[in-house]
Amino acid sequence: MEHNLLIWGKGGIMVILEFILKNENYLQDLITRSTYHSNAIEGSTLTYAETYAILYNDNSFKIEGKEPREIYEAINHKSALELVFKNLQNDDGFDERFIKRLNETINRNIKETEGFRTVQVFIQGSEHIPPEPEKVPNLMMYYIYNYNHDEQDIFAKIARYHIEFERIHPFEDGNGRTGRLLINYELLKNNLPPIVIAKEDRVKYFEFLRNNDSTGLAEWLKELSAKEEERMKKFGYKG
């Protein structure tokens, strides 16, 4: 990935994104953790070591007995996170095209999809039933418009729109992974540390979504971002 010397965003230079892209050790750490945990939340059986080996061609680690889907999920998530970085570097903005490209990247070689879903979907373990497919385009149009014009507290905004995105469930597959990538898009755009939702926190995370608890989710995301900043400091981030 080509790195710009200075990355400008909302309110000035995106120092944190600049640090991530210039610090190869932290970049690999973030991509591997984000990929491993986001996929594990959705049921992937890859270990952390297997995920790293797939993402960075570590031939010293032998991977056996894994479904091709899981391998593609790892590769695709890395590519999608890099797409987030590229969007921010180029200041391409938050629009329908970007969201669709993220989801298409997540599903590459697994479930080839183009655009929003055309079938009814259901969320396992949730009483909420996402809207009918014919309603999705308009819902997403309003979602994107409101998102781009919302100036509330950043963590409150992220939590509200993450829950709304997951309730719309605009795609046939990959909604969770896409939604979590969008969280980090908004954090980095605002020069805030990214977050990694650990697979161990899967139940807690899903409870926020099931209960439509944007206040609780906002507070938790703020804690995760602060925790990530402490980790970044171990890689040389000065704050």
Task: Please state what every model-predicted region is.
Residues M1-D173, R177-G239:
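FIC/Doc superfamily catalytic core
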